Design a protein with these regions (language model features):
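Helix-turn-helix DNA-binding module
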Residues: 100-117
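DNA-recognition helix of helix-turn-helix
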Residues: 112-135
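N-terminal interaction/assembly modules
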Residues: 1-82, 107, 136
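Short alpha-helical segments used as structural interaction elements across diverse proteins
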Residues: 26-27, 72, 93, 113, ...
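Short, conserved sequence motifs enriched in acidic/basic residues, glycine, and aromatics
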Residues: 83-84, 113
Length: 137
């Protein structure tokens, strides 16, 4: 198994900060898609003979939208990684990338009573699992 470079570690670390806002991003995108725009294909014509199925149309838009798929894939990948982590690594994950958390790795080391090097090894483990989950390692 190859090892992640420092640049990759930093990139994945930054990327995981998006996890705290992923539900909001999905909800906003869904609202954008369901906001009505002019979909009248019968401009200037007479009677429109098709039954309007607004709910079905919205769900189809959601299921075909690339942005929503990307957000959901990211969320599912992170959730699978979290399922693989033990309690301590999950706690570290929440301290670093959880909602409302802005801890540095040094602050996390202090909070979990571990050396900085030990905390960085645990970070590397979490980020390596994430890289494997998304197919980058």
């Amino acid at each position: 198994m190859s090892k992640l470079s420092n640049a990759q570690l930093k990139a994945f670390d930054e990327w995981l900060f998006d996890y705290r806002d992923i539900e909001r991003k999905i909800a906003i995108r869904k609202l954008e898609l369901q906001t009505p725009v002019s979909t009248d294909i019968n401009v200037g014509g007479g009677k429109f003979n098709l039954v309007a199925k607004e709910t079905e149309d919205i769900v189809i838009k959601w299921s075909k939208d690339g942005k929503i798929k990307s957000y959901e894939n990211f969320r599912e990948s992170v959730d699978r990684v979290k399922a693989l982590l033990d309690d301590e690594l999950n706690y570290i994950f929440d301290l670093r990338w959880g909602t409302g958390s802005n801890n540095t790795w040094e602050e996390i080391a202090y909070k979990i009573h571990t050396s900085r090097a030990g905390t960085y090894r645990k970070r590397d483990r979490i980020l390596t699992l994430f890289a494997q989950q998304i197919g980058k390692l």
